[in-house]
Amino acid sequence: MSLRIALIATVLIAIALPAIAADAQLSAAVASHQRASENTVRDRFRHPAASLAFWGLKPGQTVVEIAPANGYWTEILAPYLKATGGHYIAAEGKDGQKLPAKFADRAVYGDIGYTVFSDSSGALGSAGSADLVLTARNIHDWMWTPGFAEKGMGDFYAVLKPGGILAVEEHRADPRPQIGDARDGYVATATIVSMAKKAGFVLEASSEINANPKDTKDHPFGVWTLPPTRLSGPSGQPGNPHFDHSKYDAIGESDRMTLRFRKPA
């Protein structure tokens, strides 16, 4: 091997090693025994490693997750960002809700930051301070309050750095039309793309990672008929103990769009 070839090989290895290490950190976070079993069992539907790689998660980023609920993504993102020198921020509702108590363990999850996100909240953080904003299966809820989803898109745009990423996972109505303001939980891809573009974002890529062709999208209690919610009656009313879940369990979790938007640099 010539000296020139050896030098080129050394440079290529040096370039590749950080990416390999980052992949290893993400794999470790996904495989961690710290994750709840009710979350890991959903990985076959939510494809966390592939989704995060598609969205452009990188070591050392500042990531804001909108409405993380029980922490499906928090269990992965917070340890990963702690290990790679980044920062995880949870954007919760105006009632001051915080993540489950286990996430206070700094040795595992790092120093999780909190901010407020609602239809009347202020900025998510300092302008241009975040590398990535993640919203997973939330937008349909905001559409029931006039102007809320549009406000959200503006908030995300403001907190992101130039070149920053808006990562979206949402129940997909396509190819059938969206029903009104998505009361069944299914949103048309065109609806979200339009809102994001009006806020200034550019749609950079879409993926079928979280597609589910078994989802017929005509369930009696909307998307919540499917796992993991498995409603057996209208939302807010007592369930039907005789409801047959088998058809819906066989479908699995919903068909979802997976989108990556970018704030222009």
Predicted segments — roles?
Residues 82, 143, 160-161:
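Helix-to-beta-strand junctions that scaffold the AdoMet/dcAdoMet cofactor pocket
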Residues 60-69:
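Conserved class I S-adenosyl-L-methionine
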Residues 179-205:
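Conserved Class I S-adenosyl-L-methionine
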Residues 149-162:
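A short glycine-rich, Lys/Arg-flanked "PGG" loop and its adjoining helix->strand segment in the class I
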Residues 243-265:
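C-terminal lobe and adjacent flexible extensions of AdoMet/dcAdoMet transferase-like proteins
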Residues 26-54, 58:
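Class I SAM-dependent methyltransferase Rossmann-like catalytic core
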Residues 123-133:
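A short acidic, Gly/Pro-enriched loop at the edge of an enzyme's catalytic core
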Residues 163-171:
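Conserved beta-strand signature within the Rossmann-like core of class I S-adenosyl-L-methionine
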